[in-house]
């Protein structure tokens, strides 16, 4: 009888010990999980901060590169990058257009009345300005910031209009939308929108991008 009692007590103690071990294991696992999650959160946060810092430094490099390339004011170069981010377009395409149009000269004026960095004409500049809620002033087309805003807005509009077909957008920027249609109708290469203008802009854009990277 005593033997059975001792065995029962021993069995109970073994069971209690087993559950205590499980509980300790669960507690340890929970602590390990908490520590792991904490470390992961730190890594995630540090990674996010690193990405932000890296992105910021990259943008600063691009602004400085644009400043050296164009000789435009630093603030104007920063404005170009910010407007490209807002409009979700490649800044090197914009730089290619400005190079082709005015050779980065804010005071450039074409024989047909084109003005400023993007060589905008009134029939393009006026509706773009009015759509932006700006008062149209032809003399302000020589103002770098005003001209850049209109130029980048127009480029972004055309890229969206032609479903990201850069040659169509660039040829339309140069010739107008009707001019693009007429050009493509006369094209011998399957109604291609590739023009000397679009090819030159793309050449500049690719060169600038390659030199930057």
Go through each PLM region and give its residues.
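Catalytic glycan-binding domains that act on GlcNAc-containing polysaccharides
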Residues: 46-213
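N-terminal secretory targeting signals
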Residues: 1-75, 208-213
């Amino acid at each position: 009888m005593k033997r059975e009692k001792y065995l029962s007590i021993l069995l109970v103690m073994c069971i209690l010990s087993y559950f205590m071990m499980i509980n300790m294991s669960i507690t340890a696992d929970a602590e390990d999980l908490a520590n792991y999650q904490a470390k992961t959160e730190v890594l995630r946060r540090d990674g996010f901060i690193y990405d932000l810092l890296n992105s910021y430094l990259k943008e600063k490099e691009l602004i400085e590169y644009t400043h050296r390339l164009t000789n435009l004011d630093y603030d104007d170069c920063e404005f170009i990058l910010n407007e490209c981010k807002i409009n979700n377009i490649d800044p090197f395409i914009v730089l290619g257009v400005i190079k082709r149009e005015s050779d980065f000269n804010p005071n450039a004026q074409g024989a047909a009345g084109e003005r400023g960095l993007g060589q905008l004409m009134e029939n393009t500049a006026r509706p773009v300005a009015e759509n932006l809620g700006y008062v149209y002033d032809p003399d302000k087309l020589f103002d770098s910031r005003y001209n850049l805003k209109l130029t980048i807005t127009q480029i972004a509009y055309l890229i969206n209009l032609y479903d990201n077909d850069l040659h169509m957008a660039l040829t339309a920027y140069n010739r107008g939308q009707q001019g693009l249609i007429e050009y493509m109708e006369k094209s011998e290469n399957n109604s291609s929108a590739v023009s000397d203008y679009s090819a030159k802009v793309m050449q500049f854009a690719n060169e600038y991008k390659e030199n930057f990277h």
